[in-house]
């Protein structure tokens, strides 16, 4: 008989710029949902520059305090904080300490060094920045078609995984679609089949996992 183990290995807490939920509260919420394998993977994006966000679909400004903080963590404080929670939940869940690294070829030495600074259990490698801009912001899409913006993202993804090997699993390969104008409207994966195939083949060749990220189900699917 098979035993299904519910797990979540992409979890952000208040150590991440995009979360205000303390680690303990996040762990409790996951356990209450029946998840017993948990890896905290807060963001660390070297070279990331936050800016005011205007919703790409409404053009309304959504500038908040979150937008003014960089996506950086103090690795030692973060590691010790999560490590301290592991014994507390040992009879209810197995908790691991990870990180989500923003991959960039122009900071590859610093990113590789950070990957070695602590004994991480798990590292997600993700592309959040293309030519200095995050597709989350409408500034990324200015002066280019939706197809061009998406292709530039996949080009950057391929360059990142060719250059960097310091991660276990590649995160949210369709991140770009989540923030594209009108999201998945008029989007077909077949339009980008060649480069996506190249990305997937290289990840497999390098022994990397490929994340199944369902974050956009609540708003898109």
What is each PLM-predicted segment?
Residues 214-216:
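Basic, nucleic-acid-binding surfaces and adjacent catalytic neighborhoods in DNA/RNA-processing proteins
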Residues 20, 45, 118, 122-203, ...:
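Divalent metal-binding pocket/active-site signature
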Residues 51-52, 110, 136-137:
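Short aromatic-enriched loop/helix-cap "lid" or pocket-rim segments at secondary-structure transitions
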Residues 104-108, 151:
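Short gly/ser/thr-rich secondary-structure transition/capping motifs
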Residues 2-105, 114, 179, 186-190:
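An N-terminally biased module of ancient metal coordination in phosphate/nucleic-acid-related enzymes
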Residues 25-28, 77-84, 109-113, 118, ...:
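Alpha-helical scaffolding segments of alpha/beta enzyme cores, especially the outer helices
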Residues 5-8, 37, 94-98, 121-124, ...:
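Structural preference for beta-strand elements that scaffold enzyme active sites
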Residues 220:
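Conserved small/polar residues in nucleotide/adenosyl-binding loops
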């Amino acid at each position: 008989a098979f035993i299904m183990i519910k797990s979540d290995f992409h979890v952000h807490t208040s150590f991440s710029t995009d979360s205000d939920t303390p680690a303990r509260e996040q762990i409790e919420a996951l356990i209450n949902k029946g998840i017993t394998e948990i890896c905290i993977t807060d963001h660390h994006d070297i070279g990331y520059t936050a800016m005011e966000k205007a919703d790409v679909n409404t053009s309304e400004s959504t500038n908040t305090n979150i937008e003014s903080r960089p996506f950086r963590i103090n690795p030692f404080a973060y590691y010790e904080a999560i490590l301290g929670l592991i014994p507390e939940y040992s009879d209810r869940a197995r908790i691991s300490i990870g990180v989500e690294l923003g991959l960039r070829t122009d900071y590859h030495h610093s990113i590789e060094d950070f990957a070695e600074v602590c004994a991480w259990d798990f590292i997600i490698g993700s592309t959040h920045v293309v030519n200095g801009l995050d597709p989350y912001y409408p500034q990324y899409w200015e002066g280019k078609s939706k197809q061009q913006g998406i292709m530039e993202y996949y080009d950057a993804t391929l360059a990142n995984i060719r250059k960097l090997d310091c991660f276990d699993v590649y995160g949210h390969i369709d991140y770009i679609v989540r923030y594209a104008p009108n999201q998945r409207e008029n989007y077909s994966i077949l339009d980008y089949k060649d480069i996506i195939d190249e990305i997937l083949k290289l990840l497999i060749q390098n022994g990397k996992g490929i994340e199944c990220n369902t974050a956009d189900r609540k708003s898109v699917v």
